Amino acid sequence: MRKLHKVALAAVAVEAAAASVWAYVKWVRPWQMTWGATPEEVSREYPYDDAFEHPEWNATRAVTVAARPEQIWPFLIQIGWGRAGWYGYDSVDNGGRPSTWEVLPEHQWLEVGKDFPMSPFTAVYCGDFEELRWMLWRTGGDAGTWLWYLDPIDDTHTRLITRMRDHYKWTNPLILPQQILTELGDLPFMRKCLLGVKARAERLARVEAQQAAAGG
């Protein structure tokens, strides 16, 4: 009897796990992959989308920033561990060092091949860019792309869009744990980073507007 009870509990656990996975794939993952982005932004083609086809990871997130591209761009090109930070959860993604609210002149140069540290041991690099418009990051093996894209709405507002695309195999036991962690942890960190860029760029825009008003 006790053995049958254990079997029944195991069956219930398996069913619950399967239901959770189904709910995640059906409802949570589509929202996670498109947080803040409009249907048009999700379906739009961006630079280097043709780097590879049918990626397993294809996430497009966006936020509206009350600032011009030139007020947002400086905060993007200085991102990185030990640099400006990730404007997110500093205790986790910047070694406990607070992300800066300022534009750092020493990190305002950008060129193809420039590294952006993810941690003390890993980094992505700039694969290509168009000044004040977009910046593409690549991994060392060129397996994935990470695009930052600035789309002006009007004279004082810009859509900040990020698109991440990657290939991986769910059947690979060596990669699966990392991908599960990425699936569950990426959105909170990406959302926090986008909102961090937004807050800093809008602060800069307010300061510049006040200075212009005082000077005028």
Segments (PLM) and residue ranges:
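Short, hydrophobic/aromatic-rich segments at coil-to-beta transitions
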Residues: 107-110, 128-137
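Beta-strand/loop substructures that line and gate deep hydrophobic ligand-binding cavities in soluble
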Residues: 35, 42, 139-199
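Short, highly charged C-terminal tails/helix-capping segments
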Residues: 98, 196-216
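A short, structured loop/turn motif at beta-sheet edges
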Residues: 66-70, 128-132, 149-159, 199-206
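Hydrophobic ligand-binding cavity/cleft-lining segments
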Residues: 16-109, 123, 215-216
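Short, charged/polar surface micro-motifs in flexible loops or helix N-caps
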Residues: 81-82, 129-133, 143
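Membrane-penetrating hydrophobic segments
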Residues: 1-12
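Short, surface-exposed coil-to-beta transition loops
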Residues: 58-60, 121-122, 142-148
